[in-house]
Design a protein with these regions (language model features):
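N-terminal glycine-rich anion-binding loop in soluble enzyme alpha/beta folds
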Residues: 2-81
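Short glycine-enriched loops at secondary-structure junctions
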Residues: 39, 51, 100-102, 128-131
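Conserved beta-alpha
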Residues: 111-118, 122-151
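Gly/Ser/Thr-rich loops at beta-strand to alpha-helix junctions
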Residues: 35-40, 99-107, 148-151
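Glycine/small-residue-rich loop that forms an oxyanion/phosphate-binding "nest" at active or ligand-binding sites
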Residues: 79-127
Length: 151
């Protein structure tokens, strides 16, 4: 029997090809969202609607399974702790607290301070910040708000 290299190959010779690589994950931006413990929509919705090259990363802040002014205020330090758990070895470009009522109750300054504590260097925002900027851009003058909360 002939050595392996002397046998004719059953496979055609392949061409040498230069691989093409994409730009990598999150080449446009890495965005972090801080969610309530019981949140059920933001993470999947943001991942579904994110443009190509934008990575969506989420962490949940602990909170009682009842939304009230007291439970929202109580989660303040949990916001920064949760932000620190998102990609701890990589810099986020943007970090967002994804709770409109929580941002109003806690206050944007305190929310942003917590986001900065957990994700220093990331641009901070919240859902209410986005809403206010959108209303300003639309020059909205009369606004009606409906919420599912009793207090």
């Amino acid at each position: 029997m002939a050595p392996d290299d002397a046998r004719p190959s059953r496979w055609p010779a392949s061409r040498v090809r230069t691989p093409r690589f994409d730009q990598g994950r999150n080449h446009r931006a890495a965005i972090g969202f801080i969610l309530l413990a019981m949140e059920q929509t933001v993470d999947s919705d943001m991942a579904l609607h994110a443009p190509d090259g934008v990575g969506v990363h989420c962490a949940r802040a602990p909170m009682a399974n009842r939304v009230s002014v007291e439970t929202l205020k109580a989660m303040t330090t949990g916001i920064g702790d949760a932000a620190g758990r998102i990609l701890p070895d990589k810099q986020l470009d943007v970090v967002c607290y994804a709770c409109t009522s929580g941002s109003v109750v806690i206050g944007e300054d305190a929310v942003f301070a917590e986001l900065n504590r957990g994700a220093p260097g990331a641009k901070t925002t919240s859902l209410i910040t986005g809403v206010m900027r959108a209303l300003d851009a639309l020059q909205a003058k009369r606004i009606v708000v409906a919420t599912p909360y009793l207090d």
